Curated annotation (Swiss-Prot):
It comes from Ligilactobacillus salivarius (strain UCC118) (Lactobacillus salivarius). It comes from the Bacteria. Belongs to the XseA family. Pfam families: Exonuc_VII_L, tRNA_anti_2. Heterooligomer composed of large and small subunits. GO terms for biological process: DNA catabolic process. The gene is xseA. InterPro entries: Exonuc_VII_L (IPR003753), Exonuc_VII_lsu_C (IPR020579), OB-fold_nuc-bd_dom (IPR025824). GO terms for molecular function: exodeoxyribonuclease VII activity; nucleic acid binding. Bidirectionally degrades single-stranded DNA into large acid-insoluble oligonucleotides, which are then degraded further into small acid-soluble oligonucleotides. GO terms for cellular component: cytoplasm; exodeoxyribonuclease VII complex. This is Exodeoxyribonuclease 7 large subunit. It is found in: Cytoplasm. Keywords: Cytoplasm, Exonuclease, Hydrolase, Nuclease.
Length: 446
């Protein structure tokens, strides 16, 4: 008989079906220690372990957002969910939808964690607390419309300060919807903006009943409020995170109303006392001023009032004279300045400057003409002198006096030693030349 081999996918799918259909694996309750936990923005993946085994855990974001504490590595927890097989890796895991600390109540654990977180952020710092309005006109009350809280606040406010207007903003103060209801009402009051004080609270109850006032969203809404908030949650021994974040904490609703309002009758008494004090102070001041006035009126200055202005009149005359002289000096200086400007303007007049430049040019032309004429005459005189000297040295001038010169073979004969008997020579005279032959040579002894 041949064996049938399954694919990995087929086997995994078969096991996944078994896990899904097994009624014991559809709802499993486990206790274990958190391991490999790292907070993610979407779904959470971590492990649960004990001394002998480890199982992978997945928790969808919708379920994780409902837990009341911050999971930490090493924390022992109680979880519930269903066992599943992840086919791609072949690993089984538990997909949980609830988780709470094991050994310590989940709400107390969540409370301590959130208090620590908000304290580090500074939401409890005193410098962030807003002062209450001493004489409020409108007070917003965020609480349940039924119950002793709203009745106590109304009774106390009307007894102490009936001129204040109370406006109820009904809110759910217990259960899963309470936190969102409280946050919505806080935002609504701030958006309307015409309130001086907010009172938020509820009566006593268990930690579960009071838990909406320990939610982080409620704490941040109170911290973000632009209007001062008085928190009054539970009994005097109960301290919620809303109490820690609020600007003022009241132990009871009655105490909240007392903190929010003064006693009108006491304020009226104070006003009357202030009025009497002001009247007395004014009377004293009037009396003092009257004494001063009487003293001034009886002074010798006021008895002879002309003394008050004699010196000022003299100073005024002096100032007028100085002013007149200063004005004359100013006019004189301005006239001189004007004359100087007119002179400069006349000197720099374009037509005058053009005329002056034309005259200068004409003078330069005349000087140049005279200079050139002088140079020409001088050169003419020197030329005549040179011509006369040259004429005196001219051979024609010499021959005119009876002299002649001899050429032999085209060369001038300067010495008798250059000639020989029978040499043919040419004699040049003033008016012509003659051919001759040397017949005899006589050389004179020196």
């Amino acid at each position: 008989m041949s064996k049938e081999y399954l694919t990995v996918s087929a086997l995994t799918k078969y096991l996944h079906t078994k896990f899904t259909r097994d009624p014991y694996l559809r709802r499993v309750y486990l206790t274990g220690e958190i391991s490999n936990f790292r907070r993610r923005a979407t779904h959470q993946y971590f492990s649960l372990k004990d001394d002998n085994a480890v199982i992978s855990v997945m928790m969808f974001q919708s379920a994780f957002s409902k837990i009341k504490f911050e999971p930490e590595k090493g924390m022992k927890v109680l979880v519930s969910g269903r066992v599943d097989l992840y086919e791609k890796s072949g690993r089984y895991q538990i997909i949980i939808d609830t988780m709470q600390p094991d050994g310590v109540g989940a709400l107390y654990q969540a409370y301590e964690q959130l208090v620590k977180k908000l304290r580090i952020e500074g939401l409890f710092n005193e410098e962030l607390k807003k002062p209450l309005v001493k004489y409020p006109k409108r007070i917003a009350v965020i609480t349940s419309p039924s119950g002793a809280v709203i009745r106590d606040i109304i009774t106390t406010t009307h007894r102490r300060y009936p001129i204040a207007q109370l406006v109820l903003f009904p809110a759910v103060v217990q259960g899963d919807d309470a936190a969102d209801s409280l946050v919505g009402r806080l935002k609504q009051v701030n958006e309307e903006g015409n309130f001086d004080t907010i009172i938020i609270g509820r009566g006593g109850g268990s930690i579960e009943d009071l838990w909406p006032f320990n939610e982080e969203k409620v704490a941040r809404a109170i911290s973000d409020s632009k209007i001062p908030v008085i928190s009054s949650v539970g009994h005097e021994t109960d301290t919620t995170i809303a109490d820690l974040v609020a600007d003022v904490r009241a132990a009871t609703p009655t105490a909240a109303a007392e903190l929010a309002t003064p006693v009108l009758s006491e304020e009226i008494v104070k006003i009357k006392q202030y009025r009497l004090r002001i009247i007395q102070v004014l009377k004293n001041k009037i009396s003092n001023y009257q004494q001063i006035l009487d003293k001034v009126c009886s002074s010798y200055i006021l008895q002879q009032p002309d003394r008050l202005y004699t010196g000022y009149a003299q100073n005024l005359d002096s100032l007028i004279n100085r002013k007149n002289q200063a004005f004359k000096n100013l006019v004189y200086q301005n006239e001189k300045q004007l004359q100087l400007l007119e002179s400069n303007l006349q000197h720099n007049n374009p037509s005058i400057r053009i005329k002056d430049e034309k005259n200068n040019l004409q003078q330069l032309l005349e000087k140049m003409h005279l200079g050139m004429l002088g140079v020409f005459n001088d050169k003419s005189y020197k030329l005549e002198k040179l011509m006369s000297s040259l004429d005196m040295l001219s051979p024609l001038k010499v021959m005119n006096r009876g002299y002649s010169y001899i050429l032999k073979d085209g060369k001038t004969v300067k010495n008798v030693k250059s000639l020989q008997p029978n040499d043919d020579v040419t004699l040049y005279f003033e008016n012509g030349s003659a051919e001759a032959r040397i017949t005899k040579i006589r050389e004179e002894k020196e």
